[in-house]
Amino acid sequence: MSKRTREESEMEAGPSTASPGVSVSPAPALTAGEVQLLKVPQKRFYRQRAHANVFIDHELDYPKRPELMDWSTHYPAYFSQPNEDGTITQGEKKVEWADVGCGFGGLLMALAPLFPEKLMLGMEIRTSVTKYVTDRIAATRQAQSLLPADSVDTKPGGYQNVSVIKANSMKHMPNFFAKGQLEKIFFLFPDPHFKNRKHKARIITPALLAEYAYVLRPGGILYTVTDVKDLHEWMAHHLHAHPLFEYIPTETLSDDPILEAARTATEEGQKVERNKGDKWVACFRRKEDPKEEDED
């Protein structure tokens, strides 16, 4: 199929709704000798609901444990493909930053060239939104690879350090990440679930904080940003109450480019700015694990 015919067919058919699963690569495979120029995706071709029910079965693919995760399809520049017997060789690099409910990937795309040595992963439960971010990363990687080495548009790392996966982070975080693996976790403009009976579906709860504390290393930072004051107070209350998190005064992070990106780089954050709305920020540091008392 010619390049033009393939592109036209994809636009007519719309984005694929297949689940990215555990081993989907942001870069689609090409036949030998074929060159396909990828288009920057347009959101209007990716229909999606504003929110998803996290308690239903979304036919998700996830590893039984972190060491079984094939990251080679997400970060081909850093991980080898599985061995012939299906076993996976763990590389030196590990995913260290996770954007939970990454939406259209604004934060990931902003941070990737600023911190090219950090592997970042967006976790998104909506199929079409995940597909959009997958296509966005693939198109951006290809565009970077085609630039001359001395181009002013060349970005450090070429976006090889960023990927996205369709996942329910409320259920499967420990399936993807080992204890203390993550350095940063972002919860940016999450679903507020206003009704009291829906509060159990909020992304920050006492039970879920235990999961996040497990995968976040001591000294790591958990970022929350929202335009809903009630949700901000809810998240801050539960984080303050958790024994493994300590509050970081926002003013101490005033010069932090990561927090600035968390506030402004996401599509939701930009919409709040256009509407001149408020943004509520709370960041917490993971404490050291308590030492076990010696038995007498």
Swiss-Prot record:
CDD domains from the UniProt entry: AdoMet_MTases (cd02440)
GO BP annotation list: RNA (guanine-N7)-methylation; tRNA methylation
Active site residues per record: 191
Residues noted as binding S-adenosyl-L-methionine in the record, renumbered to the chain: 101, 124-125, 168-169, 188, 266-268
Any one GO CC term of the record: nucleus
E.C. no: 2.1.1.33
Alphabetical keyword list: Methyltransferase, Nucleus, RNA-binding, S-adenosyl-L-methionine, Transferase, tRNA processing, tRNA-binding
Pathway info: tRNA modification; N(7)-methylguanine-tRNA biosynthesis
Localization (cell): Nucleus
Family membership noted in the UniProt record: Belongs to the class I-like SAM-binding methyltransferase superfamily. TrmB family.
Name of protein: tRNA (guanine-N(7)-)-methyltransferase
Pfam families, sorted: Methyltransf_4
Principal cellular location given in the protein's record: nucleus
